[in-house]
C-alpha cells in the first residue's frame, strides 16, 4: 500500500498571489486483491486566500470573498507533512463569518466524501476478504474431499489382510511343525521297518536252516525207511535162510538123531532158534520204536518250528503291509503339505508384492497431499500477510482520519475572532505570531511547489 502527501501547484484557472496557500492531498493507493480498484481518484484540497482569486476545495469552486480583508496578524502554519487547510482559516481578521462557514462546510464535505470513499473501500475489501475466505474454505473442503479421501476402509482392509497374513503364518508354522512331526514319525517307521526287515531276514534264515533240517530229516527218514526195508528184506532172507537151514538141519538131525540118540541126548535147536528169533525180534522192535520216536520227535519239532516261523512270517508280512500303507499315506500327505506350503508361499509373496505396491501408492499419495498441504499453508500465510498489510493500511487510514478530525477540531478552536466586529481584546492585545509547526518554514508562492512524500 502506498500513501503519499505532496503539495502541488494550483490547477488551471487559479493564480497564486502573495499570501496564498495551497492544501492538497495526494492519491492514496490501496493495494488489494486482484480485481479490486488499485487507486482512489486524487482529491485536492486547495484554499487560496487572495483578494482577487477563486478558491477551490477539491474540484468545487468557491466564490470570491465579498469583504475587503485586512492583512493577517499571524503567519500561516502548515501542518506536518502537507500544506493543509487554507492559511487564513482560524486567523484573526482573515474572513468574515459567512466565508469561514463556507470553507468549513466545504472542508467537512470533502473529508466526509473521502471518509465515505474510504469506508466504501473498507467495506468492499471486507466483502472481498469474506469472498476469498469462502472461496478458500470451499477449496479446502474440495481438497479435503478430492485429495484427502477416507482411508478408513483401506485401513480396515489392511488390518483384515494383516490378520489373514498372521493366521496364514500361524497355519504355516503349524503345518511346518506337523511336517516335522511327520518326518520324525516317518524316520521312526523307517527305523522300525529296517529292524523288522532285519528280523525278517533272520526269520528267513532260520526258516532256511529249518528247511534244511527238514530236508535232512526227510532224507534221514528216507534212509531209515530204506534201512527198514532192507532190514525187512534181510529179515525175510534170514527167515528163508533159517527155514532152509532148519530144514537142512532137520534133515541132517534126523539122520544124526538116531545116532546121537544112540550115543547121547541132543540140544533142543528149536528152543535155541526161538530164543534167538525172540531176541532178534525184540532188538528189531526196540530199534524200530526208537527210530520212530526220534523221527516223530524230530518231525514234531520241525513242524512246530515251521508253524511258529510261518506265524511270525505272516505277522511280519502283515506289519510290513501296514507299514507300507502308512508310508504311502505319509508320503501322499507330505506331498500334499509340500504343495500347500508352496501355494501359501506363493500367495504370501503375491500379497506382499501387492501390499508393497499399494503402500508405495499410498505413500506417494500422502506425499502429494503433504505437498498440497504445504502449498495451502503457504497460501494461507501469504493471505495472512496480505490481511495483516490491509489491517496495517486500515489502521494507518484510521490514524489519518483521526489526524484530520483533530486538525479540524483544532482549527475550529482557533476561530474566536470576527474581522468585521473588532473586539477590545484584539485591539488591545493583537494576536502574536505562531511558530512554524511543520516542515514548511515559509508560506508563499513557493509553498505550492514543495513536495513531501512518504510510503508505508
From Swiss-Prot:
Residues 412-456 are annotated as: Tail. InterPro entries: IF_conserved, IF_rod_dom, Keratin_I. Gene3D superfamilies: 1.20.5.170, Single helix bin, Vasodilator-stimulated phosphoprotein. Pfam families: Filament. One of its GO terms (molecular function) is structural molecule activity. Keywords: Coiled coil, Intermediate filament, Keratin. Residues 140-150 are annotated as: Linker 1. The keyword Coiled coil applies. Residues 104-415 form the IF rod domain. The record marks 353 as: Stutter. One of its GO terms (biological process) is intermediate filament organization. GO terms for cellular component: cytoskeleton; cytosol; extracellular exosome; intermediate filament. PROSITE patterns: IF_ROD_1 (PS00226), IF_ROD_2 (PS51842). Residues 268-411 are annotated as: Coil 2. Residues 105-139 are annotated as: Coil 1A. Residues 151-251 are annotated as: Coil 1B. There are two types of hair/microfibrillar keratin, I (acidic) and II (neutral to basic). Belongs to the intermediate filament family. This is Keratin, type I cuticular Ha8. It comes from Homo sapiens (Human). The lineage of its organism: Eukaryota, Metazoa, Chordata, Craniata, Vertebrata.
Amino acid at each position: 500500500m502506498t500513501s503519499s502527501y505532496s503539495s502541488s501547484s494550483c490547477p488551471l484557472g487559479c493564480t497564486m498571489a502573495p499570501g496564498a496557500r495551497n492544501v492538497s492531498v495526494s492519491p492514496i493507493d490501496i493495494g488489494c486483491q486482484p480485481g479490486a480498484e488499485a487507486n482512489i481518484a486524487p482529491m485536492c484540497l486547495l484554499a487560496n486566500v487572495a483578494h482577487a482569486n477563486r478558491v477551490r476545495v477539491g474540484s468545487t469552486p468557491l466564490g470570491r470573498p465579498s469583504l475587503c480583508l485586512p492583512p493577517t496578524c499571524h503567519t500561516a502554519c502548515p501542518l506536518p507533512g502537507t500544506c493543509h487547510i487554507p492559511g487564513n482559516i482560524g486567523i484573526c481578521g482573515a474572513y468574515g463569518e459567512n466565508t469561514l462557514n463556507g470553507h468549513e462546510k466545504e472542508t467537512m464535505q470533502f473529508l466526509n466524501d473521502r471518509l465515505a470513499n474510504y469506508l466504501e473501500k473498507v467495506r468492499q475489501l471486507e466483502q472481498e476478504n469474506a469472498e476469498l475466505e469462502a472461496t478458500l474454505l470451499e477449496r479446502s473442503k474440495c481438497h479435503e474431499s478430492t485429495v484427502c479421501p477416507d482411508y478408513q476402509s483401506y485401513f480396515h482392509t489392511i488390518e483384515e489382510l494383516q490378520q489373514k497374513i498372521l493366521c496364514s503364518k500361524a497355519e504355516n508354522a503349524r503345518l511346518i511343525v506337523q511336517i516335522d512331526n511327520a518326518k520324525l514319525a516317518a524316520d521312526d517307521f523307517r527305523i522300525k521297518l529296517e529292524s523288522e526287515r532285519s528280523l525278517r531276514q533272520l526269520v528267513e534264515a532260520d526258516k532256511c536252516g529249518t528247511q534244511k533240517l527238514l530236508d535232512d530229516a526227510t532224507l534221514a527218514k528216507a534212509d531209515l525207511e530204506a534201512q527198514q526195508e532192507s532190514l525187512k528184506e534181510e529179515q525175510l532172507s534170514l527167515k528163508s535162510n533159517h527155514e532152509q537151514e532148519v530144514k537142512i538141519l532137520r534133515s541132517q538131525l534126523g539122520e544124526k538123531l538116531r545116532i546121537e540118540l544112540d550115543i547121547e541126548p541132543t540140544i533142543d535147536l528149536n528152543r535155541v532158534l526161538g530164543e534167538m528169533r525172540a531176541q532178534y525180534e525184540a532188538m528189531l522192535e526196540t530199534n524200530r520204536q526208537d527210530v520212530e520216536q526220534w523221527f516223530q520227535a524230530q518231525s514234531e519239532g520241525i513242524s512246530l518250528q515251521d508253524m511258529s516261523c510261518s506265524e511270525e512270517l505272516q505277522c511280519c508280512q502283515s506289519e510290513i503291509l501296514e507299514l507300507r500303507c502308512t508310508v504311502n499315506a505319509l508320503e501322499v500327505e507330505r506331498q500334499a503339505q509340500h504343495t500347500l506350503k508352496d501355494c501359501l508361499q506363493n500367495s504370501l509373496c503375491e500379497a506382499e508384492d501387492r501390499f508393497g505396491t499399494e503402500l508405495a501408492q499410498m505413500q506417494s499419495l500422502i506425499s502429494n497431499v503433504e505437498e498440497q498441504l504445504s502449498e495451502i499453508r503457504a497460501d494461507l500465510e501469504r493471505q495472512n500477510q496480505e490481511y495483516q498489510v490491509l489491517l496495517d493500511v486500515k489502521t494507518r487510514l484510521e490514524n489519518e482520519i483521526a489526524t484530520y478530525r483533530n486538525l479540524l477540531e483544532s482549527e475550529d478552536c482557533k476561530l474566536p475572532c470576527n474581522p468585521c466586529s473588532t473586539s477590545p481584546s484584539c485591539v488591545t492585545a493583537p494576536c502574536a505570531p505562531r511558530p512554524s509547526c511543520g516542515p514548511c518554514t515559509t508560506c508563499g508562492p513557493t509553498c505550492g511547489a514543495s513536495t513531501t512524500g512518504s510510503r508505508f
